[in-house]
Amino acid sequence: MEHSFWHSKWQKNEIGFHEPEGNALLIKYASSLLDVENSHSALKRIFVPLCGKTRDIGWLLSQGCEVVGAELSEVAIIQLFEELGAEPTITPTAKGKVYAKDGLTIHVGDIFKLTSSDIGDVTGVYDRAALVALPSPLREQYAAHLITITQCAPQLIISFEYDQNEMAGPPFSVNEKTVDALYSADYNIQRLERSVLEGGLKGKVDADNLVFALKAK
């Protein structure tokens, strides 16, 4: 991963992609994650890759979920806990640091170094910021790694589709064909929504929202 890019974004507070409230599409389609039958536990434990300081985490916690996140930028995670009003326990590890408090655990470091034992059992994956943050060469590696460390847990993916020639990204355009190519060997994929992104992406380019539910085959 290009570590310096994301560290710089957070240090300079250049985080226009960060929404002040929980994402409306998460709230609309959360049942695809939270209503999944799980024989191991009634508790919903959701993995949020490349989570940043998204307030979606607070919303998931408010629904009674435990949340496990992975994020490269420690600045983002410090801000996340401050905004949640929570004082985390911070544990250094060989792979970075773990911030934890009241059902929320964030692994600060390179997501590609995490294993299934690091994150523990999860009942679902919420990906609103990972696929669209990664350039094309890294997406295949990311998808394969995510399948491994989450043991093919169900996913809710929110992405954008737009003309990549009009804006370089990130966030990058990730269309339905790309999601199918990355995940169709392991998951049944259902597109839940395609809708126009009001105001465009960052106000610069026309774009559509795409929402997918993935269930293991």
Predicted features along the sequence, with ranges:
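Conserved acetyl-CoA-binding loop of GNAT-fold acetyltransferases
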Residues: C65
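Generic beta-sheet signal
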Residues: K44-I46, T123
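Gly/Ala-rich phosphate-binding loop of Rossmann-like dinucleotide-binding domains
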Residues: L61-S62
